[in-house]
Amino acid sequence: MTSRNYLLLTPGPLTTSRTVKEAMLFDSCTWDDDYNIGVVEQIRQQLTELATASEGYTSVLLQGSGSYAVEAVLGSALGPQDKVLIVSNGAYGARMVEMAGLMGIAHHAYDCGEVARPDVQAIDAILNADPTISHIAMVHSETTTGMLNPIDEVGALAHRYGKTYIVDAMSSFGGIPMDIAALHIDYLISSANKCIQGVPGFAFVIAREQKLAACKGHSRSLSLDLYAQWRCMEDNHGKWRFTSPTHTVLAFAQALKELAKEGGVAARHQRYQQNQRSLVAGMRALGFNTLLDDELHSPIITAFYSPEDPQYRFSEFYRRLKEQGFVIYPGKVSQSDCFRIGNIGEVYAADITALLTAIRTAMYWMK
């Protein structure tokens, strides 16, 4: 381990500001009102307001990574007679399918392939053919490839068919403008260490209160009981059922202040978009090709095909970039040899320019 700080070009954990890191230097008591009412309850309110101006929504914080919250929602929102249609076009949709299987939840997996956009007409046909489906679940920003999925169109279907709609917005909430009420989303799931630019330690769910209140007794897990966690926070002014990740929560509170200072989600989205466009243009100028067509890209992370040169090894490319202070992501696509570069977090235009210079220097197979 080195004391050097790298620029993380990843979809999270990501590079955070100095002030977000400094917020963790304070110790908090988990039952104290200054923490629970003064910090946790404020975060819950701010998250709900970021998600929608409509009434009837609430938020719940949950210890662990984003996947913990996804599993908590699936395990709590679906009753024993329910069935979920899971739209999958990457590792994170596939993970939801695996979770449902392990929990014994009835499900229909619509796998449209890793580089294909979900076919809304196909989803319509599935819903029309199977009236036992009660819920729809899908990923918004699928970081396996960098694809942005059509949550608006699927939300319209969910509304038309009267289905409960679950969206994994792990790598989009806080970085892409959305109104979850207008999108007909009943449960939105995200994490502290993504677009709001906090650090790892907890995830959160923003839910339609009426739906969440109906989850009592459904959970397949004690610690991942979303209803019980929500009731504890509601009844005890922000208190967590089990140990709260206090330092992570303080960092997140600071990150929310910095999001507002930047100009809110719209301004952050604009920065992320510009980062991603500059990255793609620069990489193409260096001879790299993107896995996806431009119209499918999210402004979060981009997958690039690996060079075909026999000398190329990702591990060596990665090492040379890391020596220059940049950390990128390996590929996660099963059928294509690629790597990924994220552009969220404390990453600005000058950082993308510096990264592209470093990549040119690291292209040892061209020398």
From Swiss-Prot:
Q: List the catalytic activities from the record.
A: (2-aminoethyl)phosphonate + pyruvate = phosphonoacetaldehyde + L-alanine
Keywords of the record, alphabetical order, are: Aminotransferase, Pyridoxal phosphate, Pyruvate, Transferase
Cystine pairs: none
A Pfam family? Aminotran_5
Q: Which cofactors does this gene product need?
A: pyridoxal 5'-phosphate
Write out the GO biological process terms.
organic phosphonate catabolic process
Q: Record's PANTHER family?
A: 2-AMINOETHYLPHOSPHONATE--PYRUVATE TRANSAMINASE
What does the protein in this record do? Involved in phosphonate degradation.
Q: How does it assemble?
A: Homodimer.
Protein name per UniProt = 2-aminoethylphosphonate--pyruvate transaminase
Q: Which organism is it from?
A: Salmonella newport (strain SL254)
